């Protein structure tokens, strides 16, 4: 069995990966747009076309990777949400859902639930223990 925090944090890490790939795609889009505008003002040379094609293909490749990651995070969120639903205590479900699905900080959770931050940390630890007990089939 995986460490429950590591397992649950997959959503956070996948989300960060997607965000970094989106930034990469935006930079590639900008490079393609700059190249496109230079095509409109200059005569197109064969090597320029090849360079443009390479950039455009990289842009398409990154876009496809992002789509795959979005599908992955969607499935992961559903699976984790269903596992969290197995917990008996509503506070545990709320804390784990806010922390690992909604990607909230402990401080944001404390404010939202009107609890002291120490209480949130204690409840989070209890929620993780219940998660391990109820969701022993983590993959």
Report each predicted region and the residues it spans:
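Short alpha-helical "recognition helix" segments of helix-turn-helix
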Residues: 108-113
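Key DNA-contact positions within bacterial/archaeal DNA-binding proteins
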Residues: 118
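Short amphipathic alpha helix immediately N-terminal
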Residues: 88-102
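Generic structural marker for isolated residues within well-ordered, non-membrane alpha-helices
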Residues: 106, 128
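DNA major-groove recognition helix of helix-turn-helix
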Residues: 124, 131
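N-terminal interaction/assembly modules
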Residues: 1-86, 133-139
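N-terminal positioning helix adjacent to the helix-turn-helix/winged-helix DNA-binding module
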Residues: 76-79, 90-92, 123
């Amino acid at each position: 069995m995986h460490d429950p925090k590591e397992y649950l944090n997959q959503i956070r890490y996948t989300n960060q990966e997607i965000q970094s790939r989106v930034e990469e795609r935006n930079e590639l889009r900008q490079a393609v747009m700059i190249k496109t505008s230079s095509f409109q003002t200059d005569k197109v040379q064969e090597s320029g076309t090849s360079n443009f094609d390479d950039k455009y293909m990289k842009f398409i490749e990154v876009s496809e990777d992002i789509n795959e990651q979005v599908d992955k995070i969607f499935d992961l969120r559903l699976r984790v949400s269903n596992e969290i639903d197995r917990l008996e205590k509503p506070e545990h479900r709320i804390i784990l859902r806010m922390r690992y699905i909604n990607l909230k900080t402990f401080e944001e959770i404390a404010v939202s639930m009107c609890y002291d931050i120490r209480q949130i940390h204690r409840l989070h630890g209890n929620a993780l223990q219940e998660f391990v007990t109820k969701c022993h089939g983590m993959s």
